[in-house]
Amino acid sequence: MIDNDRFRTENIGRHLLGFHDVSQNKVEAVANYLRSIRPEREVETYSDDFQNVFENCNEKLNTCSALFLCTGDAMTEKFVIDAFHSDNMKQPTFILWLEPFGIAGHLVYINPMQMPKNFVLYKDKGSMLYKYNLLAPIEYEINADRFTKKDAGCNGEYALYSGNDVTLMLSAFYPYINKLIQQPEQSKCYRWVGNIKLAQEKGFKLTIEVSSTTIGHVEELPL
């Protein structure tokens, strides 16, 4: 596990950890949580930026069976994609994140052995908005302050969604992740439909017609 952040009170509503873990390094606290459930489990942690760990421990990282990138940070995701394009990333990678308010969840599966050349995930380099977002691009432009909340005492910010949204998304994606780990396939994307009724209530524009889908639906899309 790699993360240079510390656990804060505002993280509690959507995390495995609780009040007794506040101010601890997230990776160390999560590692202790996992060991408390499975003492025999081997958990290795890095309290650092992914970019630094990749540069300093690239050989070791590339021995892993898969990489799960769950930062929600576009620059880290771009770093990983650039590493694929330059042939420096060798292991299958799963990129997961939720859109604000849990309106949609996304899974990008990249298999370095079966991926299109020079693939892109974003509509354009300027906005760095994912090409399969359910929220319309204009909503990210005009509602940026409504979609994120700043961490108290630091310069970071995070999208608004609940722990329940995370559980629902992961439950929907798990069968696909398990299958792809066991039987690697062509690189692809998946989109989980979440709180679209909430999007309607708040008047948010979507990139699809609500009548064309259902809550909980998982759609496979090309990388």
Go through each PLM region and give its residues:
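The conserved SAM/SAH-binding core of class I Rossmann-like methyltransferase domains
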Residues: 2-4, 96
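Glycine-rich phosphate-binding loop and adjoining beta1-alpha1-beta2 segment
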Residues: 4-41
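Hydrophobic pocket-lining residues within nucleotide cofactor-binding pockets
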Residues: 12, 50, 98
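Short low-complexity, flexible loop/linker segments enriched in glycine and/or proline
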Residues: 15-16, 59, 109-110
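S-adenosyl-L-methionine
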Residues: 32-57
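Short beta->alpha linker loops
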Residues: 49, 71-72
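Glycine-rich phosphate/adenylate-binding loop
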Residues: 62-66, 72-223
